[in-house]
Design a protein with these regions (language model features):
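Conserved "turn/edge" positions that cap or connect secondary-structure elements
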Residues: 1-177
Length: 177
C-alpha cells in the first residue's frame, strides 16, 4: 500500500488516521515495528485513540504466537506496544481456533471478542463460538456468553460484540436457545 512508507507485506493492514494532524499510522505491526506477516482485519479504537484492537492471522506480532490461528491484538499508539488479547487468564494462547471481532472500551482497558477457542476460560466445553472479555489491567479473560447462573450457551455466540464505554456491558448475538 502507499498509505505509509515501507509497507511491503502484501497483506491487509490496519491503519489509524488522525484527522487533526492529518497523519496515517499503520497499527498492525509488532512492538518492534515489524510489519505483520498475514492479513489483519476487524478494528475498534478507544475513545482517545490511544488503543486500537484488531484481529490478525500474523504470527509475528508478539513473541510465542504459535497457535496458527487468527488472534486479537491491541496496539498502544502512545507506547508503540502490541499485546495479544485472545489469551486465557493464565496467559495461555487460544488453541487452534479463531478469535476475532474485537470491541474495545473507551479507556482501552477491556476488549470483548468472539472466539471458538475452547481453552480461554474454565469450563468451556460447549464446542461453540463464545464471547469473551479481556481485562488488560488485571490480565484476566472472562467468558460472557453465559446465562445469569453462569451456564454456557448451547449454541454459537458470534459476530461482532459491542462493549460499553466503561466496560461493564457487552452486547452480542447468539443462537443459544
Amino acid at each position: 500500500t502507499n498509505l505509509v512508507p515501507g509497507d511491503t507485506n502484501n497483506s491487509d493492514d490496519i491503519f489509524v488516521r488522525d484527522l487533526l494532524t492529518n497523519t496515517t499510522t499503520r497499527v498492525s505491526v509488532s512492538g518492534a515495528g515489524n510489519q505483520a506477516i498475514g492479513n489483519s482485519f476487524s478494528t475498534s479504537i478507544s475513545a482517545n485513540g490511544q488503543f486500537v484492537a484488531f484481529s490478525s492471522l500474523a504470527s509475528n506480532l508478539v513473541p510465542g504466537d504459535t497457535n496458527g490461528a487468527t488472534d486479537v491484538f491491541v496496539r498502544d499508539l502512545f507506547t508503540n506496544t502490541t499485546t495479544r488479547v485472545s489469551v486465557g487468564s493464565a496467559g495461555n494462547q487460544g488453541n487452534i481456533f479463531t478469535s476475532s471481532f474485537p470491541s474495545i472500551s473507551a479507556d482501552g482497558r477491556f476488549v470483548a471478542f468472539a472466539s471458538d477457542a475452547t481453552n480461554l476460560a474454565p469450563g468451556d466445553t460447549n464446542n461453540r463460538n463464545d464471547i469473551f472479555v479481556r481485562d488488560l489491567s488485571t490480565n484476566t479473560t472472562t467468558r460472557v456468553s453465559v446465562d445469569s447462573a453462569g451456564n454456557q450457551a448451547n449454541n454459537n455466540s458470534f459476530a461482532i460484540p459491542s462493549i460499553s464505554g466503561d466496560g461493564r456491558f457487552v452486547a452480542f448475538k447468539s443462537n443459544a436457545a
